[in-house]
Amino acid sequence: MSGEALQRWWHWAQGIIPAPERESGLRELKQFLRAFTGLSPLEITLRRFPPQIHLKLPLTELQERWQRRWQERVPLQYLIGVAHWHDLELVVTPSVLIPRPETEELLAVVAATVPPWQQQGHWLDLGTGSGAIAIGLARLFPAALIHAVDCSSEALEVAQVNIQKYALGDRVRCYVGNWFDPIVPLQGQVQGIVSNPPYIPTSVVATLQPEVQYHEPLLALDGGTDGLQAIRQILETAPEYLQPQGWLFIELMATQGKAVAALAMATQAYERVEILRDLSGHDRFLLAQTP
């Protein structure tokens, strides 16, 4: 494709961005173009395109994908096939939730909490999706063996691609199944559990922005009537798997802090229960520790 033709395409592409979203849409357009042309951020920002540009897919498909972003509200990450999260570039498909900044904060909480002597042994990522948490844990704790569980075989295929991409296949094991079901042999042996489970109440799912409501996997979003179905199950079962002084970290909806803390205390299985806030000041994470 010629640089002149790409200039014309750019003019068309920015023209279909809805006016209220123009600023964020232009940022997305730059990411979109970079993903499929290999041009540098500076070349794209200044629109100084070389005479000839190699497209990674036909121009007609490039155009169709960009139209889908605005006509169907397909998330950019699904259109380009990757999501940037923490310091990782993760493959994503509509089979997995797009990793969020809040989950980066969840890993930061883990890093700041767990002492060196517990940064080894068995760690669980329940509901791994793209594998973001499992990969983050493996990089954070080089001496640990990570067990990544998801009920979706399609999601696990994506996770395995990402795990191999970061050469962690020997330290991250994947299991298909519902929460603890595939890892029963690990009862009593686990140092810590980290999870970003579905926590949105069913009635709230229908109010989410179209990018989420219509395109991200419902399995990863819908937490049942009160949003706590999965969290309740994890809280009740985790003590059977954790070693003494084992850790449990769960990401929550901003309004669920008090309810989740009460559920954790009601199990009488944890000696320490805390609700921690995210960088926006919202209740976001449960930290619990067994005796």
Swiss-Prot record:
Where, in this chain's numbering, is S-adenosyl-L-methionine bound?
G127, T128, G129, S130, G131, D150, W179, N196
Q: What class of enzyme is it?
A: transferase
**Which molecular-function annotation in GO is an example for this chain?**
nucleic acid binding
Identification of the protein by name: Release factor glutamine methyltransferase
Which GO biological process entries does UniProt record here? methylation
> Catalytic activity, per the record?
L-glutaminyl-[peptide chain release factor] + S-adenosyl-L-methionine = N(5)-methyl-L-glutaminyl-[peptide chain release factor] + S-adenosyl-L-homocysteine + H(+)
Similarity section = Belongs to the protein N5-glutamine methyltransferase family. PrmC subfamily.
Q: Which gene encodes it?
A: prmC
> What EC number(s) is this enzyme filed under?
2.1.1.297
